[in-house]
Amino acid sequence: MELVFIRHGFSEWNAKNLFTGWRDVNLTERGIEEAKSAGKKLLEAGFEFDIAFTSVLTRAIKTCNIVLEESNQLWIPQVKNWRLNERHYGALQGLDKKATAEQYGDEQVHIWRRSYDISPPDLDPQDPHSAHNDRRYAHLPSDVVPDAENLKITLERVLPFWEDQIAPALLAGKRVLVTAHGNSLRALAKHIEGISDADIMDLEIPTGQPLVYKLDDNLKVVEKYYL
């Protein structure tokens, strides 16, 4: 069975070198072109999907739509879910990465960004940009909405969606596209590939490039490659 991951195309805050997380920013022209290229590659390689999963953030949704349009599959069902959102970067969201390193030191920022189980400082729930004040999360219990996450917590958030939605779709024989974010996809990759806590820190997923998994009947990875 086939599973394809695509990290959203290059975003406005990727271009500005800002911590993004759950902040909702748009694609750049480069990001749009990356998504178009991904869709064309999938079309040329003969990939057909039965269902697509994405987050509730604009950059991932738009990437999904563009990829499906370019591959002539915009009509297939799409499921949007908050569990596929990017890792929440807490109080770092909206800050310049270079300036943050100058303020707190390279080592501290590296720990916040790359350690598996250490989170950055929480974002104040009363902050106007907090997810607690965003109506797309109004249906969630307050204690479920994060104020900051590390990759371990991100995996704990993403995994129920894998088990409840993505894995059952694959086991039912559906061909699945997941268009999401660097860290939510890294979390899924860690789970399905069995990557260790230490090794996952070295895994990078580039923007806008289809990552193909061939899986056996037990959802074990048989083959993995980029188009």
Swiss-Prot record:
Q: Which EC class, in a word?
A: isomerase
Q: Which GO terms describe its molecular function?
A: phosphoglycerate mutase activity
CDD domains from the xrefs?
HP_PGM_like (cd07067)
Q: Can you tell me which residues bind substrate?
A: 7-14, 20-21, 59, 86-89, 97, 113-114, 182-183
Q: Which InterPro entries match?
A: His_Pase_superF_clade-1, His_PPase_superfam, Phosphogly_mut1
User: Is Isomerase one of the keywords UniProt gives this record?
Assistant: yes
Supply the EC number(s).
5.4.2.11
Q: Which residues form the active site?
A: H8, E86
Q: Which reaction does it catalyse?
A: (2R)-2-phosphoglycerate = (2R)-3-phosphoglycerate
One annotated GO biological process: glycolytic process
Q: Where is the signal peptide?
A: none
User: Would I find Iron among this entry's keywords?
Assistant: no
Gene3D superfamilies per the UniProt record, alphabetical: Phosphoglycerate mutase-like (3.40.50.1240)
Q: Which UniProt keywords apply?
A: Gluconeogenesis, Glycolysis, Isomerase
- Return the SUPFAM superfamilies for the record: Phosphoglycerate mutase-like
Annotated site (Transition state stabilizer), which positions?
A: H181
Q: Name one Pfam family in it.
A: His_Phos_1
Query: Where does this protein act, in terms of pathway?
Result: Carbohydrate degradation; glycolysis; pyruvate from D-glyceraldehyde 3-phosphate: step 3/5
Tell me, what does this protein do in biology?
Answer: Catalyzes the interconversion of 2-phosphoglycerate and 3-phosphoglycerate.
The UniProt subunit note reads as follows: Homodimer.
In the record, the note on similarity to other proteins reads: Belongs to the phosphoglycerate mutase family. BPG-dependent PGAM subfamily.
Write the protein's name. Answer: 2,3-bisphosphoglycerate-dependent phosphoglycerate mutase
